[in-house]
Amino acid sequence: MKEKEENLIAQNKKARHDYFIKETLEAGIALTGTEIKSVRARRINLRDGYVQIINGSAYLENVHISEYKQGNRYNHDPLRSRRLLLHKKEINRLAKVQAERGIAIIPLKVYLKHGFAKVLIGVGQGKKEYDKRQTIKERDQKREIRRKYGI
């Protein structure tokens, strides 16, 4: 039996509530030693994070990775910018998309794949308040149908 390759570390549940996700993309994250140890311990928060393109490189901003308990003086800054490992074509495409008004590039989840930390980033357009209410209403209707018909 094949072993599970992806190990989910953190998920940004609020992102799908606040944005219409148009496309997703997998990227590696350049982390220091104490950061990867904290990530493996699931001490990461994606809630306020976003991706920014600066000088042809993609950076993960405002993602909190807690300090490693045994890291002593070699610990990292919890909110530092972390470089995303993407191909140039992918970065250029994201830069064009980011230039559009109302488009955000946000981290959706962080997971380990074959021992490497990966982040699934999504290109999303912000939802208005009535869109959020409509989504909740549709979800409740689907839940009622499942209960009624036992699907």
Curated annotation (Swiss-Prot):
- Subcellular compartments: Cytoplasm
Whether Cytoplasm counts among this entry's keywords is: yes
Entry-linked InterPro entries: SmpB (IPR023620), SsrA-bd_prot (IPR000037), SsrA-bd_prot_CS (IPR020081)
Q: Which GO terms describe its molecular function?
A: RNA binding
Role noted for this protein: Required for rescue of stalled ribosomes mediated by trans-translation. Binds to transfer-messenger RNA (tmRNA), required for stable association of tmRNA with ribosomes. tmRNA and SmpB together mimic tRNA shape, replacing the anticodon stem-loop with SmpB. tmRNA is encoded by the ssrA gene; the 2 termini fold to resemble tRNA(Ala) and it encodes a 'tag peptide', a short internal open reading frame. During trans-translation Ala-aminoacylated tmRNA acts like a tRNA, entering the A-site of stalled ribosomes, displacing the stalled mRNA.
Q: Which UniProt keywords apply?
A: Cytoplasm, RNA-binding
* Claim: RNA-binding is one of the keywords in the record: yes
What is this protein's gene name?
smpB
Q: What family does the entry list?
A: Belongs to the SmpB family.
Q: Name one Pfam family in it.
A: SmpB
Q: What biological-process terms (Gene Ontology) are attached?
A: trans-translation
Protein known as: SsrA-binding protein
